[in-house]
Amino acid sequence: NKALRLTYTGSTILGAITINVGSGTTQTQTQAGYPTLSGSLPLVKTGGGTLVITAANTLTGSTSVQQGTLQLANAAALASSKVIPLAGGTVSLAPYLQTTVGDLAPNAGGLVDLANGLVTVASGLSPTDLVTAIVAGRGDGSWTGTSGITSSVAASDVAVSLPRAVGWLDNGDGSVTAAYAAPGDTNLDWQVDVLDASNFLSFGKFDSGLAATWLEGDFNYDGVVDVLDAADFFGTGLYDAGNYNTPPGASGIAAVPEPSAATLAALAVAGWAAIGYRNQARRACRHDR
């Protein structure tokens, strides 16, 4: 499974670390002959099987997934590498993993499956390109897109009418984050609480028509915050319910600040607006029949 291959990039021929894992097979990087991945040579994953990156590697060369699945299973698995899932290739996260990659090309034709985890891209990926990838992965709303960024866990949840999605953050330092999330979880801490309510209200984007982000309350990726997003916020039933993405054996309870009277009042207004919108939509639907 260990091979040296020549790749042509522009006018330069470079060596590459090629790891082939056959269909129906799962191997860790150690089993594939690479207990550590380091240096500047690119890594190329081939074959229809799954390669699991278990170590904290220092590889600075790019990582391309041509076929099959490359699963990240360490918080620093490819912290300095640009990860490129090509058409026919998938990058996935181990359950509940929170990891960092050096860069990510989620619009290169392949798929990134966050499962119920979180990935931070250190540099190189713009918020615009990140949202483009998320919208592709969302597909028709079922989170079963064949390219971009998706979540197989969100897809399973949505299939049983449990509202889940992929949330995202522009961290302000050149890095961006994407994670399995519930609508309303503005800060991606896997809770919907007063901090999220404050974000939804304090940024002043609700019904303003101004461009907005997930942090500011845009949960359906249409670039604005409106009654549809308020409906998404309240539709999860998760407000003040604790952690909704707790690993087995871990506590799902965390202390949060008490909401102010003003926050509660504003939430009530937004909530009633969302309820009114839903009732209006139902009446219109009955009328059409």
Write out the residue ranges for each language-model feature.
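Glycine-rich phosphate/pyrophosphate-binding loop
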Residues: 141-179
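A cross-kingdom C-terminal cell-surface attachment/processing module
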Residues: 261-279
